[in-house]
């Protein structure tokens, strides 16, 4: 029963992430919170607004990144959301397993 509960949570989150790929205005905090709910560790990197999304279930040399812009409350551009969505779909099994 526990597996079904976690899978439905994962499915709900992935569906929300998919919806954001066509959204015109996704706030940085909404996007970041969704990634954290999927188990990502989000780190600020160097310049203003740039973030790296690492997932403990996936070992890579280079992880996907995104930009929140330079102003607080700025929207995340769709190409970044699509890149992270593709990453989650590529590593779906490992991320699902990690969420158990």
Regions found by a protein language model. Give the residues of each.
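Negatively charged, low-complexity tracts enriched in Asp/Glu with abundant Ser/Thr
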Residues: 2-38
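A short, structured beta-strand/loop element
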Residues: 34-68
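C-terminal basic regulatory modules in eukaryotic proteins
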Residues: 2, 19-24, 29, 64-100
């Amino acid at each position: 029963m526990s597996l079904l509960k976690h899978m439905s949570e994962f499915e709900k989150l992935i569906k929300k992430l998919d919806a954001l790929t066509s959204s015109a205005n996704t706030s940085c905090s909404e996007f970041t919170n969704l990634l954290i709910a999927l188990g990502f560790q989000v780190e600020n990197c160097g310049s203003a607004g740039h973030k790296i999304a690492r997932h403990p279930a996936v070992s890579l040399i280079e992880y996907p990144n995104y930009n929140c812009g330079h102003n607080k409350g700025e929207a995340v551009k769709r190409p970044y959301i699509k890149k992270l969505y593709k990453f989650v779909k590529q590593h779906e099994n490992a991320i699902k397993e990690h969420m158990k």
